[in-house]
Swiss-Prot record:
<feature type="binding site">
    <location>
        <position position="295"/>
    </location>
    <ligand>
        <name>Mg(2+) 2</name>
    </ligand>
</feature>
<keyword id="KW-0808">Transferase</keyword>
<dbReference type="GO" id="GO:0052725">
    <property type="term" value="F:inositol-1,3,4-trisphosphate 6-kinase activity"/>
</dbReference>
<dbReference type="GO" id="GO:0052726">
    <property type="term" value="F:inositol-1,3,4-trisphosphate 5-kinase activity"/>
</dbReference>
<dbReference type="GO" id="GO:0000825">
    <property type="term" value="F:inositol-1,3,4,5-tetrakisphosphate 6-kinase activity"/>
</dbReference>
<dbReference type="GO" id="GO:0005524">
    <property type="term" value="F:ATP binding"/>
</dbReference>
<dbReference type="GO" id="GO:0000287">
    <property type="term" value="F:magnesium ion binding"/>
</dbReference>
<feature type="binding site">
    <location>
        <position position="157"/>
    </location>
    <ligand>
        <name>ATP</name>
    </ligand>
</feature>
<dbReference type="Pfam" id="PF17927">
    <property type="entry name" value="Ins134_P3_kin_N"/>
</dbReference>
<dbReference type="GO" id="GO:0016853">
    <property type="term" value="F:isomerase activity"/>
</dbReference>
<dbReference type="InterPro" id="IPR041429">
    <property type="entry name" value="ITPK1_N"/>
</dbReference>
<keyword id="KW-0413">Isomerase</keyword>
<keyword id="KW-0460">Magnesium</keyword>
<feature type="binding site">
    <location>
        <position position="106"/>
    </location>
    <ligand>
        <name>ATP</name>
    </ligand>
</feature>
<feature type="binding site">
    <location>
        <begin position="188"/>
        <end position="199"/>
    </location>
    <ligand>
        <name>ATP</name>
    </ligand>
</feature>
<feature type="binding site">
    <location>
        <position position="297"/>
    </location>
    <ligand>
        <name>1D-myo-inositol 1,3,4-trisphosphate</name>
    </ligand>
</feature>
<keyword id="KW-0479">Metal-binding</keyword>
Length: 407
């Protein structure tokens, strides 16, 4: 790898907070030792003058959201970034902007999860029913909720899946609680999961599963409980100690996540969106043992992932050698967006024709302590050694395009 990477140039744009949190300078130093030049990009200046660039790593989520609010400076930055991408299709972007936009919208990402679950037809996976509320709750809201397969209690989240406010959530137990809901938002069925959340941190074909505390169990059906408002970031911190996470007793089944299921979900999302750096929040239904994806995050914090920098550099090497499946989809993604009349720019779904594992064998489970709320469960490589059915692409594109055209 070292010989191949020598002389390559990797540009990155991250907020100063993200750089400090990740200690990204350590990654830059690791790259330099491998002969890779790392360039911190200044988007206020022409990117052309800062090139050439073989790969660009970014987290432009804040800038994209501000641009969507018509902030003139952010609009200019996003436009400059997009113009460089258009002028340099040979540059690998981690990750493509259309995919980031999908992950920034919980309604769209949940719909994608639903379509993937429908395609996979794996009984070990369930997609929690959800719906988007775009206006204040009225007399017909309860009917709509029932029509969409939701039942009390359910969890209410902001539609935007990024930023401080995105962690502010509520558990609604009855019709009275609907009065406090502030649209636009997304409501999602609450699934009892014995107060355990599994955060899956994905880097290309590698992933790490970290165990975190989560919400305790609640009785199914309508109750007279008052709505519970909470910050999910605080609840699921490694060191979190909250009455909301204090489990009276383990109910139903208590299972660890199935490695095969995690691998298949991660692979499906990579293929559907063409993304490399993302996080998946998974809970295990304590009645059925099914895995439920309750959130997806673009370029998460990777807390507890000790090998993040090594995985990232390995992935960069793989994409530059054309061995990472998601990267081969970028040009096809653009074509699909054009073919669907532009509306698919935020709903792109494309599949690989196959992928090659270059990372080696899967490593074993590592459980440091059953009482530790932040336990690293595993560090795995996604070994994809079989072709993916072309119908996967057709299924996702057709269903999402149909939904998009109906809105």
């Amino acid at each position: 790898m070292q010989t191949f990477l020598k002389g390559k140039r990797v540009g990155y744009w991250l907020s100063e907070k993200k750089i400090r949190k990740l200690n990204f300078q350590a990654f830059a130093e690791l790259c330099r030792k491998r002969g890779v030049e790392v360039v911190q990009l200044d988007l206020t200046k022409p990117i052309e003058d800062q090139g050439p660039l073989d790969v660009i790593i970014h987290k432009l989520t804040d800038v994209i959201l501000e641009a969507d609010q018509n902030d003139s400076q952010s609009l200019e930055l996003v436009q400059r970034f997009q113009e460089y991408i258009d002028a340099h299709p040979e540059t690998i972007i981690l990750d493509p902007l259309p995919a980031i936009r999908t992950l920034l919208d919980r309604s769209k990402s949940y719909e994608l999860i639903r379509q993937i679950e429908a395609y996979m037809q794996d009984e070990r996976i369930c997609s929690p029913p959800f719906m988007e509320l775009t206006s204040a709750c009225g007399e017909d809201t309860l009917q709509l909720i029932e029509k969409n397969g939701l039942a009390f209690p359910f969890i209410c989240k902001t539609r935007v899946a990024h930023g401080t406010n995105s962690h502010e959530m509520a558990i609604i137990f009855n019709q009275e609680g609907l009065k406090a809901v502030r649209p636009p938002c997304v409501i999602q069925s609450f699934i009892n999961h014995n107060a355990v959340l599994y955060k899956v941190f994905v880097v290309g074909e590698s992933y790490t599963v970290v165990k975190r505390p989560s919400l305790k169990n609640f009785s199914a059906g309508i109750s007279d409980r008052e709505s519970i408002f909470f910050n999910s970031h605080n609840v699921s911190k490694p060191e979190s100690s909250s009455v909301l996470t204090a489990l009276d007793k383990i109910e139903g089944v208590f299972e660890r996540p199935d490695d095969d299921v995690i691998r298949e979900i991660s692979k499906a999302l990579r293929q559907a969106l063409g993304v490399s750096l993302f996080g998946i929040d998974i809970i295990i239904n304590n009645q059925t043992g099914q895995h439920a994806v309750i959130d997806i995050n673009a370029f998460p914090g990777y807390e507890g992932v000790s090998e993040f920098f090594t995985d990232l550099l390995n992935h960069i090497a793989a994409v530059l050698q054309g061995q990472a499946p998601e990267v081969t989809q970028l040009n096809r993604s653009k074509l699909l967006a054009e073919q669907t009349g532009g509306i698919m720019d935020e709903r792109i779904c494309c599949a690989s024709t196959g992928c090659i594992s270059v990372m080696g064998k899967d490593s074993s489970w590592i459980v440091e302590s059953e009482t530790n709320s932040s336990v690293k469960l595993q560090h795995q490589r996604l070994g994809c050694n079989s072709a993916v059915s072309p119908s996967f692409q057709q299924h996702c594109v057709a269903t999402l395009a149909t939904k998009a055209s109906s809105q």
